């Protein structure tokens, strides 16, 4: 059965999104500074390998997983000369059935959680894959980002920032078409679920903080990314941006 992204040109989605991509690369590199040594990484939902260059320089072995045969084929072509990367077509829940558990120093999952409804099960699966003291870099779509909060305030919904339940932002047409869910999460829910699954939170970053078509037209990419780099840590406390990156560590019991 084809995966959802087999019927979608995901690489083209990233055309004209150099700022968003660069912001995510910067976030991963910043979080990696907290980890002294990484040998083996598994990236969940890694697609066509967009983010591999952001961490491959730090690791010896990489397993890139994705449900989409089409995206993995793109990744294989892109990294055909790399001996450190292996490719695995699998959904997250099936990964532990085909790879050794407690075998990875680091798991990375970016732009995946918004398609997952059972996040508790997802975090438990990641926990099983990680070795003792293993790390988890997670990205999630932030329900409470500043633009959404202002929009709800103007609409009279002053309790919006405190409503912890997730929101599926698909259109009615997409819901009727049974497309993948697209869920924005409250940061407090994510932190609570990670801790329940056996993780300690090491650091969070607010990402894509100045995402704006207007700013992209007005300023060069390097300038925007320099500003983004300066903002990711200071704005993490209020979860300002539409995307939040988390570094968590498997708790030692």
Predicted regions and their residues:
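A conserved beta-strand element that flanks and buttresses the S-adenosyl-L-methionine
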Residues: 108
């Amino acid at each position: 059965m084809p995966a959802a992204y087999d019927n979608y040109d995901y690489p083209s989605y990233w055309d004209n999104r150099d700022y968003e991509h660069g912001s995510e690369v910067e976030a991963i590199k910043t979080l990696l500074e907290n980890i002294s040594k990484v040998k083996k990484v598994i990236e969940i939902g890694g697609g066509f390998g967009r983010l591999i260059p952001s961490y491959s320089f730090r690791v010896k072995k990489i397993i890139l997983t994705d449900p989409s045969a089409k995206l993995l084929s793109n990744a294989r072509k892109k990294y055909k000369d790399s001996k450190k990367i292996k490719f695995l077509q699998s959904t997250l829940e099936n990964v532990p059935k085909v790879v050794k558990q407690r075998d990875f120093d680091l798991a990375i999952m970016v732009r995946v959680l918004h398609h997952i409804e059972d996040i508790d099960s997802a975090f438990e699966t990641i926990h099983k894959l990680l070795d003792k003291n293993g790390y988890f870099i997670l990205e999630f779509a932030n329900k409470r980002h500043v633009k959404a909060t202002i929009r709800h305030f103007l609409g009279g919904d002053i309790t919006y920032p405190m409503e912890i339940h997730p929101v599926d932002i698909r259109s009615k047409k997409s819901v009727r078409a049974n497309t993948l869910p697209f869920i924005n999460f409250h940061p407090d829910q994510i932190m609570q679920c990670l801790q329940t699954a056996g993780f300690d939170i090491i650091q969070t970053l607010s990402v894509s903080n100045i995402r704006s078509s207007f700013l992209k037209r007005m300023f060069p990419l390097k300038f925007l990314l320099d500003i983004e780099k300066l903002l990711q840590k200071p704005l993490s406390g209020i979860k300002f941006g539409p995307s939040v990156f988390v570094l968590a560590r498997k708790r030692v019991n």
